């Protein structure tokens, strides 16, 4: 039977076309549907013969896991056990959208899930009453097939229905991510957190979204505040990141992948200033580079986006609480004893060393609080 290629009507209800696509899926026919990333072969996962046919057409081995596309984020709960909170934050940010999540299923295996950001295809999924597989194709001699023209040129003889919604907006595959469970890896006085909230978000495929996009969207932000954001607060953020990295058995750079973003700002900062010479030197003595730090002025948005805000002195505490009084309970002095961390600005290297030591003592207590609060929700 010749391919039926149907343009998606921009100015009328596509309900009849939705019904036709659903009927074709249930009959085990070969469809191509659009998404915001690339077009793909659509198949009903309850039809094993149709699923294997699409695997063969796309060069996938028998039994290869395919991504289940859902109509809405709410459908997730029926597919897998509740994921960790940080994964939910990620899905709330990027679903519908170009993110595929590999989540633990009820049987312990991984389930690949996505909610595409294409109204027509989501309407088809919703009307079908179940998720569908939407499978991209990348023939060896053609590379990735992005749009309707590509599929028509290569698979016209094998396609029953192709819904043409024009070129896909992104023309790039989704990013695929999975959560690797955390576990104690480094012996020491503090026990490494084993909650799934601290597992590493591993990118199995980098597509439209970068690693930074994914990690930042899922992370809890911990904000340190001083005056100019050139001495104490950047040093505190860097020391907290280093202590967390050692605890989790990872590098400073990959702490973000484990769900924590340590940031800093100043209540009277001039944006774009480098770290002070003293802080650069004090950090370098413990193997931390602050060369790329640039100061940022504290604002309400930073506070509202942070899980906790730690101020280096009483004046910073007052200023931060005045900016966001509704978050006052989450804004505290870094020193649990209520003392401010001494300001070394303009002093000798020994002054910066004393400040570094005071920050380390305060962090030794505060990090346990942070880990416990995140694990408890």
Where does each model-flagged region fall?
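Hydrophobic packing residues within well-ordered alpha-helices of enzyme cores
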Residues: 54, 76-79, 236, 240, ...
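Conserved active-site segments centered on acidic
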Residues: 219-306, 370-376
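Conserved hydrophobic residues forming the short capping helix/wall of the S-adenosyl-L-methionine
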Residues: 58, 244-248, 320-324
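Short clusters of hydrophobic/aromatic residues that line enzyme substrate/ligand-binding pockets
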Residues: 6, 113, 176, 290, ...
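Phosphate-binding/catalytic loops
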Residues: 135-139, 200-202, 308, 314-377
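Short beta-strand scaffold positions
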Residues: 70, 311-312
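Active-site-adjacent structural elements in enzyme catalytic cores
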Residues: 1-223
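Conserved beta-strand segments of alpha/beta enzyme cores
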Residues: 4, 131, 161, 261, ...
């Amino acid at each position: 039977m010749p391919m039926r290629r149907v343009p998606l009507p921009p100015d009328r209800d596509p309900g009849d076309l939705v019904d036709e696509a659903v009927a074709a899926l249930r009959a085990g026919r070969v469809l191509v549907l659009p998404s915001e990333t690339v077009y793909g072969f659509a198949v009903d996962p309850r039809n094993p013969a149709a699923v294997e046919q699409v695997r063969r057409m796309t060069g996938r081995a028998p039994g290869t896991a395919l991504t289940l596309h859902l109509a809405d984020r709410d459908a997730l709960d029926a597919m897998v056990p509740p994921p960790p909170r940080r994964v939910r934050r990620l899905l709330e940010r990027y679903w519908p959208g170009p993110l595929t999540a590999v989540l633990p299923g009820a049987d312990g295996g991984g389930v690949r899930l996505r909610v595409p950001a294409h109204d027509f295809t989501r309407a088809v999924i919703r009307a079908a009453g179940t998720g569908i597989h939407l499978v991209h194709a990348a023939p060896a001699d053609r590379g990735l097939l992005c749009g309707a023209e590509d599929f028509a040129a290569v698979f016209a003889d094998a396609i029953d229905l192709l819904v043409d919604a024009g070129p896909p907006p992104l023309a790039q595959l989704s990013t695929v991510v999975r959560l690797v469970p955390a576990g104690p890896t480094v012996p020491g006085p503090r026990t490494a957190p084993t909650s799934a909230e601290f597992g590493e978000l591993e990118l199995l495929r980098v597509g439209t979204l970068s690693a930074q996009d994914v990690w930042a969207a899922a992370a809890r932000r911990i904000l340190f505040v001083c005056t100019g954001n050139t001495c104490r607060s950047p040093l505190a953020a860097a020391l907290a990141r280093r202590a967390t990295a050692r605890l989790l058995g990872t590098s400073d750079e990959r702490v973000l992948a484990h769900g924590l973003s340590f940031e800093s700002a100043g209540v009277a900062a001039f944006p774009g200033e480098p770290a002070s010479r003293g802080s650069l030197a004090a950090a370098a003595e413990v193997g931390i580079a602050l060369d790329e730090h640039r100061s940022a002025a504290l604002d309400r948005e930073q506070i509202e986006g942070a899980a906790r805000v730690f101020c280096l002195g009483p004046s910073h505490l007052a200023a931060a609480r005045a900016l966001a009084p509704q978050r006052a309970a989450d804004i505290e002095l870094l020193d649990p004893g209520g003392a401010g961390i001494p300001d070394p600005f303009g002093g000798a290297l020994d002054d910066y060393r004393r400040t570094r030591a005071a920050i380390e003592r305060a962090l030794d207590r505060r990090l346990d609080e942070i880990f416990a609060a995140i694990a408890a929700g």
